[in-house]
Every structure is written in C-alpha cells, then in structure tokens.
Amino acid sequence: MEDVQNSPAQVAMPIDRVGVKNLKLPLVVRDRAQGSQHTVATVDIGVDLPAEFKGTHMSRFVEALENWSEELDYNSMKRLLEDVKERLHARKAYALFRFPYFVRKGAPATASSGLVWYECRLTGELGDGKPSFLLELEVPVMTVCPCSKAISDEGAHSQRAVVRMSIRMTGFSWMEEFIDLAEAAGSSPVYTLLKREDEKFVTEDAFAHPTFVEDVVRAAAQRLEGHPHVAWFRVEVESFESIHCHNAFASIEREVRKG
C-alpha cells in the first residue's frame, strides 16, 4: 500500500511536535503509603517531524502506549520516549501524563478517613542528550485573611486556594512530600470527610494561622528551596476570594543551587 506519510511535504518546513492527544490509559504510580496505586491518565505524546516528510505515523504512538504497561516513574518514562523515538525515527520525543493522585487523609479530630485527590502532570522530553522531566501538582488549601481578622470584631473571611507547583528534580521524591509542604504553607489543609468536631477544629486552627497568598507562596517556595532533590521550581498560589468577585495570586520561580 502507498505510504502517503513518507511522501514529500508540499511546504518543506520542520514541525516541532506532532502526535496524539487526550488518549485515556490505566496507570500505576508509586504511593508512599501503599507502595503503588491505580489511576487513569490522559496522555499526550508526540515527536518532531523533519521538513521533507508529509506526515507522521499516528498509529505508532498508540502502539507504543499499548505495549507499555509499566509503573510510571522517570525510568519507565525514559524507556517510553526511547521507544517512541525509535518507532517514529525521530530526533525528539515528548509525553505528558495527566492523572488524579489520591491520598487517604484522616480528619484532625475524629480521624474519619476520606480520599483527597490532587491533579498531577508528568512531562518528559528526550532529544540527543539526557531526558528532562517536569512534575506539576495542584494542592488545595484553606486561607484566612490576616487583614480581615485584624480589623473585624467577629471572624474573618476565609476561602479555598490552590498551590500549583512545577518542579524539576535530581532524584526520586514521593508525591506526598510536595503535597505536605504545600498544605503546611496554608492556613489549613482541606479534607473530604469532616464531622462536626473536625469542622470546629479546622475552623479554629485556620483562624489561628491567617495567611495572605504572599505568605503561602513564600512558605511553599522556602520549603521547595530546602528540598534535597529540587533543582528548579515554579510555585503559584491562587486564592478564590470569598468576598471579592476576583481571585488573588502570587508566584515565585527559582533555580536551586545546592552546596
């Protein structure tokens, strides 16, 4: 049969990235509490395309993922990228896995147990040299406004905020390490299951630890700078203001120099 993809391109221009998007895939990831957990990923995967070729071979991306059934980590992602490069005769390969990561969390007063989910993204790129990886996490927290607390006779406005972290690492770290440091930066973590005793505890504890988005982003950045395996990070905190019709945000980006 005629191989149209390998025919000459009408416009001889190289393509930076071409492939498939939004492919659903069952996935196993490492879990600090249980060793591993099963989740579902949405995958984007692609390669570069030289100027002389009309198109890529889309089916080969799906074949690569169908033949890949490993636990997701940096080493297995590297093997997947190498396989894609070889199948497509490409110089560069790229993959993005988006998935919910679940942590079972006990409520602070009653220890009632519930699963909290965190949106995660792992991106890998491989060219001629070493692969590069980027881990992204979204961690919800609660914040209480210090200004509102200072000027109000009763109470203060509070809201949910999200800590978004993008991290490049030099070694293995548990996802929970970054979840923990983000939650510690806010006024309080958030929970799935809370009884009345828990709600009382969370409300009073958060009120005792008021934080601006500026406080949260600085606290998270300080902890990321001190992490032994973090080489670069970007952290953004977005607060979904309860008494305003807009959101507040703050962000910090740093390259971490060790030693």
From Swiss-Prot:
The organism of origin for this protein: Nitratidesulfovibrio vulgaris (strain DSM 19637 / Miyazaki F) (Desulfovibrio vulgaris)
Residues the UniProt record annotates as site (May be catalytically important): C145
Pathway(s) the chain acts in: Cofactor biosynthesis; 7,8-dihydroneopterin triphosphate biosynthesis; 7,8-dihydroneopterin triphosphate from GTP: step 1/1
Family note: Belongs to the GTP cyclohydrolase IV family.
Biological role: Converts GTP to 7,8-dihydroneopterin triphosphate.
Record-linked Pfam families: GCHY-1
GO BP: any one term: tetrahydrofolate biosynthetic process
Catalytic activity: GTP + H2O = 7,8-dihydroneopterin 3'-triphosphate + formate + H(+)
Flavoprotein keyword on record: no
A molecular function (GO) term: GTP cyclohydrolase I activity
Enzyme class at the top of the EC tree: hydrolase
Keywords annotated in UniProt: Hydrolase
Documented EC number(s): 3.5.4.16
Listed name of the protein: GTP cyclohydrolase FolE2
Keyword Flavoprotein applies: no
